[in-house]
Amino acid sequence: MSEGGKIPLWIVAVVAGMGVIAVVGIFFYGAYAGVGSAV
């Protein structure tokens, strides 16, 4: 594995994981907010 200025895999994994968690969190927050306002 050569270090040719490539981004470390763990950084990519952390960023991707945080992005997924953020999207899921926003989705659930929107769902709960929508249900709360509807009810």
Curated annotation (Swiss-Prot):
From which organism does this entry originate?
Picosynechococcus sp. (strain ATCC 27264 / PCC 7002 / PR-6) (Agmenellum quadruplicatum)
| UniProt cross-references to InterPro entries, sorted A to Z | PSII_PsbJ, PSII_PsbJ_sf
Transmembrane in keyword set: yes
Membrane-spanning ranges: 7-27
Described by its record, this protein's role is as follows: This protein is a component of the reaction center of photosystem II. One of the components of the core complex of photosystem II (PSII). PSII is a light-driven water:plastoquinone oxidoreductase that uses light energy to abstract electrons from H(2)O, generating O(2) and a proton gradient subsequently used for ATP formation. It consists of a core antenna complex that captures photons, and an electron transfer chain that converts photonic excitation into a charge separation.
What is the protein's quaternary organization? PSII is composed of 1 copy each of membrane proteins PsbA, PsbB, PsbC, PsbD, PsbE, PsbF, PsbH, PsbI, PsbJ, PsbK, PsbL, PsbM, PsbT, PsbX, PsbY, PsbZ, Psb30/Ycf12, peripheral proteins PsbO, CyanoQ (PsbQ), PsbU, PsbV and a large number of cofactors. It forms dimeric complexes.
Membrane topology per the record? Single-pass membrane protein
- According to its UniProt record, which protein family does this protein belong to? Belongs to the PsbJ family.
GO terms in the biological process aspect are:
photosynthesis
Gene Ontology CC entries for this record: photosystem II reaction center; plasma membrane-derived thylakoid membrane
Q: What is this protein called?
A: Photosystem II reaction center protein J
Q: Say where the protein is mainly found.
A: membrane
Keywords assigned: Membrane, Photosynthesis, Photosystem II, Reaction center, Thylakoid, Transmembrane, Transmembrane helix
Pfam families membership: PsbJ
Places the protein is found: Cellular thylakoid membrane
SUPFAM superfamilies on file: Photosystem II reaction center protein J, PsbJ (SSF161021)
Intrachain S-S bonds: none
PANTHER family of this UniProt entry? PHOTOSYSTEM II REACTION CENTER PROTEIN J
| Source superkingdom | Bacteria
